[in-house]
Amino acid sequence: MPPKKKIAALVKVQLQAGAATPAPPVGTALGPHGVNIMEFCKAYNAQTESMRGNVIPVEITIYEDRSFTFITKTPPAAELIKKAAGLQKGSGVPHKEKVGKLTKDQVREIAQTKLPDLNANDIEAAMKIVEGTARSMGVTTD
């Protein structure tokens, strides 16, 4: 078994799927660690090509020898809620001013998408988490 690489840093960024460029935020996040930014952009874009149009969080593990690995997550719940409700952004005063509405089916669909990344055992618990996020954005659920 080869010796384990020592981890130098863990960087988390949210990027448009299939559209990462060496410009900020990628360059500013990876530059100080001496990682080949173009190499990361190519690998990330290739892996997220099928999810274009979504914001995809990525966790980049940078090792001491300047190599890296990355894990893509599911899109943020807030992004999925905005897309489902057809909104540009959430409410500025969420508990007073409601800006949209989601059906139970839409909430279930979002929860299904987010389930691998959520700390929930079943779809019902995941739906409650998504409903809470929607509430804090000023979106009502039936």
From Swiss-Prot:
Disulfide bonds: none annotated. One of its GO terms (cellular component) is cytosolic large ribosomal subunit. Pfam families: Ribosomal_L11 (PF00298), Ribosomal_L11_N (PF03946). GO terms for molecular function: large ribosomal subunit rRNA binding; structural constituent of ribosome. Keywords: Methylation, Ribonucleoprotein, Ribosomal protein, RNA-binding, rRNA-binding. One or more lysine residues are methylated. The keyword Ribonucleoprotein applies. GO terms for biological process: translation. Belongs to the universal ribosomal protein uL11 family. Part of the ribosomal stalk of the 50S ribosomal subunit. Interacts with L10 and the large rRNA to form the base of the stalk. L10 forms an elongated spine to which L12 dimers bind in a sequential fashion forming a multimeric L10(L12)X complex. Forms part of the ribosomal stalk which helps the ribosome interact with GTP-bound translation factors. NCBIfam families: L11_bact. This is Large ribosomal subunit protein uL11. The lineage of its organism: Bacteria, Bacillati, Actinomycetota, Actinomycetes, Propionibacteriales.
